Structures are given as C-alpha cells and as structure tokens.
Amino acid sequence: MADQSCIAEALQWAYVQLAASSESAHLDAEVLLLYCLNKNRAYLYTWPEKALSVEQWKRFQQMVQRRQQGVPVAHIVGEREFWSLPFIVNDTTLIPRPDTEILVESALNLPLESNAKVLDLGTGTGAIALALASERAAWQITAVDKVEDAVALAKANRTNLKLEQVEILQSDWFSAVTSHDFDLIVSNPPYIDEADEHLHQGDVRFEPQSALTAADEGFADLYYIAKTARDYLKPNGYILLEHGFEQAVKLRAKLIELGYQNVATVRDFGSNDRCTMGKWMGLIGI
C-alpha cells in the first residue's frame, strides 16, 4: 500500500474496503476523509487530485479499518449532526438518529406557551432537549439521565452549543424531578425487545444495551413513563414518546387506558410509526 494518496484514490480505496461490511460505504468514506482533512464535502470533489499528507493517509486508513470492524462512524469521529447541530458522542449513550428529529418537530408543533416547561427523560447526548432549546429559547427545559457519564456528555454538548439555559440532572426517570407542572414531557426511552436479534448486528453492537432494550417486549419503560408522567404534567399538558414502528397500536391503547386524550401517532421520514402523543386533562385518577 502506498505511503500517500490523492483524495479520489483514497475515497475509492475506502469504498472498496467498506463495501462488504457497510450499507453506507460511500457516505462512510466521505465522512471519515472529511474528518481527516477538516474540510467540507465540496472540497473533496473540487480538488480530487489533491494529495493527502503521509500522516493524513495513515490516519484515514486506521479509521477505515475501525469502520470495517463495525465501529460506528460517529464513534470514530466523536461527533454526529442532529437537527443541524453538532453533537459530541461516545459509547456511553445512543448515537442520535435522524428519525428522532420527528419527535423534535412534533414537539415544536404543539400549541405551547412561549415559556413552556418541558422535561426530557433519558436525554443521553442531550440531543432532543438541546434541539428544542435551539428553537425555543424561552422554554424552560429540564433534561435528565440516570447514567452519570451521559449527564456529563449532555452538559458538554450544552456548553459547546451555548445553550446553558437547559437544566441537566442525573435522575432515574422522575426520581430527582421536583416540578409537577410540566407543559410537555418527551422521551426516547429504551424500547427494543431484549430478545431482538438485531441487537447483535450493525452499529448497535457498540451502543449500551441499557439505552436500547426494555422488558415486556420493549414496552416496560414506555408504559412506566406514560403512567408516571400524569403526576408531573399540568392539566392540558402533553406527553410525546418515541417508539418502535410496530409498537404504536399498543402504546396508543395504553395512553387511552391511562386517561390521555387526543392520542395520535406521527410517522417518520420512512413512513413508519415513530412517535405517539397524548394530552393529559388532569381529570382522571387511574
């Protein structure tokens, strides 16, 4: 293997290396090379003949080899874009997914006051809470996670994005939450069945299982949040939960059973059921 390469050759080499192990080999190669060069995508195709330095080429090869081993690109570069914001990521929590932007969009579309109080449960990187804060500066947002390292990561992203108005706490779901007058409670909790065979495939192998799986065929945390949230929502407050595409029917039924009204599901960019919401009137004690 040569000690140096130009951009076009490096991309082609990386694609060949990754084609058998990644469904997004072209994109992976681009993202990794952009990170090595600290350039934007246009640069790659404007200057395909530009030579990489010996150090850049060596580093790029090492990163491609890690990707061949299945390590997520976001973990290799330490960053993932979400809601057009750069988030620091690591292996202590989930990598933000594009589908979760539907939850953010749905929250922003709710008829809330300009100073609404919002709680984000299981915040992980802080992606949902910080994306909302970037759009609604006056919202009073609290984000919680039970994992100490995840809380530290969310705080680092808060500082990096200059969104210090967001309160971030360590809390096992509601355990450290003292307010009981939220206008909106959002969560992307663990919702994958513990027996799901896909947990042993692809990028999720490198993410914490505790952030992915839940008991009761993946419904345990969804049901717990839906039930407990009623004690933390003000009358006419909303709950908004992300879930698996096959869980919408049962989750809607559970929300209705618990006394929520105006229960509805929103589909993601792939037309899969992704988020379900309900309005808590504060009138039924169940």
UniProtKB/Swiss-Prot annotation:
Residue positions annotated to bind substrate are: 188-191
Signal sequence interval, chain numbering: none
Write out the catalysed reaction: L-glutaminyl-[peptide chain release factor] + S-adenosyl-L-methionine = N(5)-methyl-L-glutaminyl-[peptide chain release factor] + S-adenosyl-L-homocysteine + H(+)
Q: Which residues bind S-adenosyl-L-methionine?
A: 122-126, 145, 173, 188
Q: Which UniProt keywords apply?
A: Methyltransferase, S-adenosyl-L-methionine, Transferase
According to the UniProt entry, the coiled-coil residues are none
The GO biological-process annotations, alphabetized, read as:
methylation; translational termination
> Could you tell me what this protein does?
Methylates the class 1 translation termination release factors RF1/PrfA and RF2/PrfB on the glutamine residue of the universally conserved GGQ motif.
UniProt record similarity statement: Belongs to the protein N5-glutamine methyltransferase family. PrmC subfamily.
Q: What is this protein called?
A: Release factor glutamine methyltransferase
Q: Which organism is it from?
A: Shewanella oneidensis (strain ATCC 700550 / JCM 31522 / CIP 106686 / LMG 19005 / NCIMB 14063 / MR-1)
